[in-house]
Amino acid sequence: MLQVYLVRHGETQWNAERRIQGQSDSPLTAKGEQQAMQVATRAKELGITHIISSDLGRTRRTAEIIAQACGCDIIFDSRLRELNMGVLETRNIDSLTEEEENWRRQLVNGTVDGRIPEGESMQELSDRVNAALESCRDLPQGSRPLLVSHGIALGCLVSTILGLPAWAERRLRLRNCSISRVDYQESLWLASGWVVETAGDISHLDAPALDELQR
């Protein structure tokens, strides 16, 4: 059975400021660095063999801290990037016009083909993050990979494994540096393929962490 761990990046400056990041970037805060060190300690205990990360700066930094603890190299995969939020990237949520807020809410409330202008649809996001996960099946037998990605991206991935459409209402809370686990297995009692073992574990963190809807 292949076990794949999923980690959201540490808290960033724009998370704390409630600004929309998408594929734009801001650095980890001091708290985010601490969260990454705490998840790194947990990852070392899990026997991680490979670290595969989104190539955006906030995930790169989180992955670097984890890799140092685990003694692993990092593979960067752009398919693990966050949802492209188009014209709303870098904007403070509280500054959005009514029309702009409606664009953003489409992605939260489950609108088929919802899309921010110049951004991605949830289906496009789902296609690429699921392809990145599927690539883990090509790793050597006995591998235990850890993927470092983003809140909406990982939420979409876990939700689609559970059988929900990519655009379904967002009802999964994945806080900064939370750990989820998905397994690929053949089972008599569960559907064969990917199954969700855990989602959003923050027991390794010593302080409250932000979820995507609190940014």
From Swiss-Prot:
<dbReference type="InterPro" id="IPR050275">
    <property type="entry name" value="PGM_Phosphatase"/>
</dbReference>
<protein>
    <recommendedName>
        <fullName>Probable phosphoglycerate mutase GpmB</fullName>
        <ecNumber>5.4.2.-</ecNumber>
    </recommendedName>
</protein>
<comment type="similarity">
    <text>Belongs to the phosphoglycerate mutase family. GpmB subfamily.</text>
</comment>
<feature type="binding site">
    <location>
        <position position="58"/>
    </location>
    <ligand>
        <name>substrate</name>
    </ligand>
</feature>
<keyword id="KW-0324">Glycolysis</keyword>
<dbReference type="GO" id="GO:0005737">
    <property type="term" value="C:cytoplasm"/>
</dbReference>
<dbReference type="GO" id="GO:0006096">
    <property type="term" value="P:glycolytic process"/>
</dbReference>
<dbReference type="GO" id="GO:0016791">
    <property type="term" value="F:phosphatase activity"/>
</dbReference>
<feature type="binding site">
    <location>
        <position position="60"/>
    </location>
    <ligand>
        <name>substrate</name>
    </ligand>
</feature>
<feature type="binding site">
    <location>
        <begin position="82"/>
        <end position="85"/>
    </location>
    <ligand>
        <name>substrate</name>
    </ligand>
</feature>
<keyword id="KW-0413">Isomerase</keyword>
<feature type="site" description="Transition state stabilizer">
    <location>
        <position position="150"/>
    </location>
</feature>
<dbReference type="InterPro" id="IPR001345">
    <property type="entry name" value="PG/BPGM_mutase_AS"/>
</dbReference>
<feature type="binding site">
    <location>
        <begin position="8"/>
        <end position="15"/>
    </location>
    <ligand>
        <name>substrate</name>
    </ligand>
</feature>
<feature type="binding site">
    <location>
        <begin position="21"/>
        <end position="22"/>
    </location>
    <ligand>
        <name>substrate</name>
    </ligand>
</feature>
<dbReference type="Pfam" id="PF00300">
    <property type="entry name" value="His_Phos_1"/>
</dbReference>
<comment type="pathway">
    <text>Carbohydrate degradation; glycolysis; pyruvate from D-glyceraldehyde 3-phosphate: step 3/5.</text>
</comment>
<dbReference type="InterPro" id="IPR029033">
    <property type="entry name" value="His_PPase_superfam"/>
</dbReference>
<feature type="binding site">
    <location>
        <begin position="104"/>
        <end position="105"/>
    </location>
    <ligand>
        <name>substrate</name>
    </ligand>
</feature>
<feature type="active site" description="Tele-phosphohistidine intermediate">
    <location>
        <position position="9"/>
    </location>
</feature>
<dbReference type="InterPro" id="IPR013078">
    <property type="entry name" value="His_Pase_superF_clade-1"/>
</dbReference>
<feature type="binding site">
    <location>
        <begin position="151"/>
        <end position="152"/>
    </location>
    <ligand>
        <name>substrate</name>
    </ligand>
</feature>
<dbReference type="GO" id="GO:0004619">
    <property type="term" value="F:phosphoglycerate mutase activity"/>
</dbReference>
<feature type="active site" description="Proton donor/acceptor">
    <location>
        <position position="82"/>
    </location>
</feature>
<dbReference type="InterPro" id="IPR023086">
    <property type="entry name" value="Phosphoglycerate_mutase_GpmB"/>
</dbReference>
